[in-house]
Amino acid sequence: MWSKSISSVLWQTPSRRSNSLKNISLRLSNCDKQSAQRKISLEQFRSFSCGNQSLKMRFIQFQRKNDQSTRLGVISNDGSIVTDLSESYPTDMKSFIQSNVSLNDVQQKVNSGTKLQLSDVKLLAPINNPEKIICIGLNYKGHCEEQNKTPPTEPMFFTKFASCIVGPSDDIIAHKITDQIDWEVELAVVIGKEAKHVARESAMDYVFGYCVAQDISARDWQKVKNGGQFTIGKGMDTFCPLGPAIVHKCLVADPHNLTIKCSVDGVSKQSGSTSELIFRIDDMISRLSQSITLKPGDVLLTGTPAGVGMHRSPPEFLRVGNVVESEIQNLGKITNKVVADN
């Protein structure tokens, strides 16, 4: 159509030709605008688009005082104000992620939602019922070096259970069957939409957000007992503290350039950067999705830097009364106390 219009203009007088070309240019410009509008509309419809960088989306699950029901909300960047979104959306995080709401819609609800002081709520784990928690071992160069191991050429995946999850200030149980409980601060990735046979180039499109995690481990059960299988050593109740919020990916410019650290009773134990990851997040998602369908709300733990207790000289393990602080740049801090197994 456009080639015919332009061709006919060439045979017009100079003045008419100028006006006709202006009209064609205007029509092309309008088409470009309409196309852009359609593209924007489509992106807003897609799973939690990053169209507005000013949106402060730190998603939480919480309880109000004197109310044991789980509620959905967002917390301010400084951690002082909670906005309750429970009247507008599902009250559990997995269902909310599955609902595929646009961030612009969420922002409108945040603007009008009930505001609460942090002191008036209890933060829960930001997600407590993922279908899967998939972890990776030996994924930091320093963690390989402290074990005198060559960095792997293939990822070593294993799993934890939803029953491992506790909140950002909940206790870690020192189970009676182990005396070798160890710390492992990790970056957790929360999946935003179903991922199956995903190419590495598009894998980050399937991420919803990030949070701080602790892959608490019973080393005796991980390494010696249970035939050397990880299931019990990694899967005991309370062995996966998460929090304090799921920070939407729009607020994380580069998840592979975040400082990550852990302390016990105020003493630094781990200090590293996610830039040390051997298998990056996109690689993990792509590899897993070739055989395991990742679902909205699934949690991927990306490994831990050097400094775990088992590989210290002499080895160090957590004891009742210890307080473990785990922190990642821009994502926040979780603080968990070790308590006796009653």
Region locations from a protein language model:
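Structural signature of FAD isoalloxazine-binding scaffolds in flavoprotein oxidoreductases
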Residues: P151-P168, I181-W183, R319-N330
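Generic beta-strand structural signal
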Residues: E131-I134, E154-M156, D170-I172, D179-L187, ...
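Catalytic-pocket segment enriched in acidic/His residues
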Residues: G51, Q107, T114-L116, K122, ...
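Short catalytic-site patches enriched in acidic/histidine residues
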Residues: M156-A174, A195-K196, T238-V247, P305-G309
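N-terminal non-catalytic cap/leader segment that marks the start of a structured domain
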Residues: W2-K4, W11-R16, R27, C31, ...
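RNA pseudouridine synthases
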Residues: E184, I191-K193, V198-A213, R219
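A generic local secondary-structure boundary/capping motif
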Residues: F48, L123-A125, E145-N148, I172-I181, ...
